[in-house]
Amino acid sequence: MSNENDDLSPQRRAPRLNERILSSISRRSVAAHPWHDLEIGPEAPSVFNVVIEISKGSKVKYELDKKTGLIKVDRILYSSVVYPQNYGFIPRTLCEDNDPMDVLVLMQEPVLPGCFLRARAIGLMPMIDQGEKDDKIIAVCADDPEYRHYTDIKQLPPHRLAEIRRFFEDYKKNENKDVAVDDFLPPNSAVNAIQYSMDLYAEYILHSLRK
């Protein structure tokens, strides 16, 4: 007959913890942050990495939680519109609103939030959101055979541009928030805006290191 204390035998092995669990417990390592740890790419500012926050066709407004690096649910859109294309940000960039540079990426399929891809800038959409500058880079997926040949926003069908403009003009109307979209600008304006945001980010890092 077995002894009730057999289960408490000192010879019984404890479950093994892998290195990831151990490092998390000891807090000796930190998970990669998509804004700061992912490189922008060797061809930037023309071709660059984009971290997708919101999938094409989604009504959920996801966004980067800057403290944790995770993608969080910000809100559900108040109107019936959905995001016309995949939407995200360029790592290692910084804009005047203290956020990374926003990008709308045209491609065939929706991409899961948190994934990253290579994109090419084809234009810039100047935008004012509630009185503050909030420009968007318009880009195409550099590895999508249907879109990678586009190099200028003027090459897009007029309906596609109207769709993008109307989405951003309307998506906050039911929240009583004003958004104004100006005329689309050419690729060089987008490239210059990205380079400026890269320079701002570099200054931010240098300032942080001096503290």
Swiss-Prot record:
Might you name a Gene Ontology BP term for this protein?
diphosphate metabolic process
List GO terms (cellular component aspect). cytosol
Residues binding Mg(2+) 2? D102
- Cofactor(s) the protein requires to work: Mg(2+)
Disulfide bonds, which pairs?
none
User: What is the activity regulation comment for this entry?
Assistant: Strongly inhibited by Ca(2+).
What compartments host this protein? Cytoplasm
Q: Metal-binding as a keyword?
A: yes
Known EC number:
3.6.1.1
Q: Which GO terms describe its molecular function?
A: inorganic diphosphate phosphatase activity; magnesium ion binding
In its keyword annotation, does this UniProt entry include Metal-binding? Answer: yes
Q: Which reaction does it catalyse?
A: diphosphate + H2O = 2 phosphate + H(+)
Q: Which InterPro entries match?
A: Pyrophosphatase, Pyrophosphatase_sf
Active site residues according to the UniProt entry: Y83 (proton donor)
| Gene3D superfamilies listed in its UniProt record | Inorganic pyrophosphatase
Q: Where on this chain does Mg(2+) 1 bind?
A: D97, D102, D134
Q: So where does substrate get bound?
A: K61, R75, Y87, Y171
Q: Provide this UniProt record's keywords sorted from A to Z.
A: Cytoplasm, Hydrolase, Magnesium, Metal-binding
Q: Which family does it belong to?
A: Belongs to the PPase family.
Also noted in the record is: At least 2 separate genes code for soluble pyrophosphatases in potato. This protein is probably encoded by the Ppa1(a) locus located on chromosome 12.
Q: What does this protein do?
A: Catalyzes the irreversible hydrolysis of pyrophosphate (PPi) to phosphate.
Q: What is this protein called?
A: Soluble inorganic pyrophosphatase PPA1
Q: Which organism is it from?
A: Solanum tuberosum
